From Swiss-Prot:
This is Argininosuccinate lyase. It is found in: Cytoplasm. Signal peptide: none annotated. InterPro entries: Arg_succ_lyase_C, Argininosuccinate_lyase, Fumarase/histidase_N, Fumarate_lyase_CS, Fumarate_lyase_fam, Fumarate_lyase_N, L-Aspartase-like. Its EC number is 4.3.2.1. It comes from the Bacteria. SUPFAM superfamilies: L-aspartase-like. It catalyses: 2-(N(omega)-L-arginino)succinate = fumarate + L-arginine. Belongs to the lyase 1 family. Argininosuccinate lyase subfamily. GO terms for biological process: arginine biosynthetic process via ornithine; L-arginine biosynthetic process. Keywords: Amino-acid biosynthesis, Arginine biosynthesis, Cytoplasm, Lyase. It comes from Renibacterium salmoninarum (strain ATCC 33209 / DSM 20767 / JCM 11484 / NBRC 15589 / NCIMB 2235). It holds the Pfam family ASL_C2.
Length: 471
């Protein structure tokens, strides 16, 4: 069976017959590209104006065109105008709507000097630039939640871990700020990406540019871009801006997943570091006692989805010769999904973090355990002039002695330390405390309370510019 007509498409005159129903179904994209309708209409207004400036529309025709486009925009917004079954894509649907309102003679003039190839490349960038700012706001809300918890628990110690084993005491605020720094870089990446996304492919035509005297920079300016592309082939064929957005989205997903993994662990009975707020946890259909960290688990799961969006898009792009290929119809759903996923996920994650109830007593109790002060012993010896290689050995011997007795380092007697080495004098006890360990790490980047306060000031200085971007 074949379609009775090729109406709703922007091509067909050179063909003897209509496309097969199977091809028409495969080609149809209005079910996902309709969300670009308002960008398409904005582009049509800008295009009409450059047609008029080039002498291809009269002033009267321009007024009629803009009136028809405004009416179509209102009908799209209200839902009075939607894509028809015969429409191949958003571009064809909106041209149909324009012709219905302006008539075929005037409405048919708008397509001069533009192609779906440059339209979709430009409108995709416009969509992503808007949604980059929405995503940035969500990430900033998550950062703010981390900062608020860091402020509220500035002096609280906790076990710092490597390999998930006790390593050295750190401040909870220092740990939370580590996650905040990662997310700050994500927003900075979006801000940096936006400079590359702010170049308009509109005016590139199918691939070779326009011969009608149209000004692509005028369209770029009206649509909020910084400039037009310098290479029309690159403008229509490249999707690195899409892929880069998807990579940043995946990185945000990974960073949220790492936070979430810790919260899942911290909320277990074995850790008991945090209690989840009822508003951000769920129960079990069979076990009445359960309080499940579903937000954190879904964040962890959706990170895989975001990585999948990126890898799928890159796989689509990897084999495409210049310039445009129909494979690029597949460029939109991955980035649409990435934006949608983060815009859904981020409010839940920021809310979960903001409402965490930290069991600070348990965190501080566990902070020095597991011989977490062993490095402080070695560092103390270094300050006494002992080479670090020897200091490391002596500290390890003290750990072995304490472990054999089932006690911590501070439980060893002065005599036991002296038996290990005369260099382990009673003055060693000045560092055998959580407070002493923390205070000693006062260099930039350290976990001492003073260093964390300095870190916070540096963080705020970098945060201000990205807040401006997200507005």
């Amino acid at each position: 069976m074949t379609s009775a007509t090729n109406g709703g498409s922007l091509w067909g005159a050179r063909f003897a017959g209509a496309p097969a129903d199977a091809l028409a179904a495969l080609s149809k994209s209005t079910h996902f590209d309709w969300r670009l309708a308002r960008y398409d209409l904005a582009g049509s207004r800008a295009h009409a104006r450059v047609l008029q400036r080039a002498g291809l529309l009269t002033d009267v025709e321009l007024d009629g065109m803009l009136t028809a486009l405004d009416g179509l925009d209102a009908d799209v917004t209200s839902g009075a105008f939607v894509a028809a079954e015969s429409d191949e894509d958003v571009h064809g649907a909106l041209e149909r709507g324009l012709i219905e309102r302006a008539g075929p003679e005037l409405g048919g003039k708008l397509r001069a000097g533009r192609s779906r190839n440059d339209q979709i490349a430009a409108f995709g960038r416009m969509f992503l630039r808007d949604h980059a700012r929405l995503v940035a706001r969500g990430v900033l809300a998550t950062i703010d939640a981390l900062l608020a918890q860091a402020t509220a628990h500035h002096g609280v110690a906790m076990p710092g871990r490597t390999h998930l084993q006790h390593a050295q005491p750190v401040l909870l605020s220092h740990h939370l700020m580590a996650h905040a720094w990662a997310l700050l870089r994500d927003v900075q990446r979006l801000q940096d990406w936006d400079r590359r996304a702010a170049v308009s492919p509109y005016g590139s035509g199918a691939l070779a540019g326009s011969s009608l005297g149209l000004d692509p920079n005028a369209v770029a300016d009206e649509l909020g871009f910084d400039s037009a592309v310098w290479n029309s082939i690159d403008g229509t064929a490249s999707r690195d801006v899409f892929a880069e957005f998807s990579w940043i989205a995946a990185m945000i997903g990974v960073d949220l997943s790492r936070i979430s993994e810790e919260i899942i662990l911290w909320a277990t009975k074995e850790f008991s570091f945090v209690t989840l707020d009822d508003a951000f946890s769920t129960g079990s259909s069979i076990m009445p006692q359960k309080k499940n960290p579903d937000v954190a688990e879904l964040a962890r799961g959706k990170a895989g989805r975001l990585i999948g969006d990126l890898t799928g898009l890159l796989a689509t792009l990897k084999g495409l010769p210049l310039a445009y290929n129909r494979d690029l119809q597949e460029d939109k759903e991955p980035v649409f999904d990435a934006a949608d996923t983060l815009e859904l996920l981020l409010p839940a994650v920021s809310g979960m973090i903001a409402t965490l109830d930290f069991n600070t007593e348990r965190m501080e109790e566990l902070a020095p355990l597991g011989f977490a002060l062993a490095t402080d012993v070695a560092d103390w010896l270094v300050r006494q002039g002992v080479p670090f290689r020897d200091a490391h050995e002596l500290s390890g011997a003290a750990v072995k002695q304490a472990e054999s007795r089932g006690v911590e380092l501070w439980d060893l007697s002065d005599a036991e330390y002296a038996a290990i080495s005369p260099q382990l004098t009673p003055e060693l006890r000045t560092v055998l405390s959580t407070e002493g360990s923390l205070a000693s790490r006062s260099a930039q980047g350290g976990t001492a309370p003073s260093a964390v306060l300095a870190q916070r000031a540096a963080f705020e200085a970098q945060l201000a510019p990205v807040r401006d971007f997200a507005r």
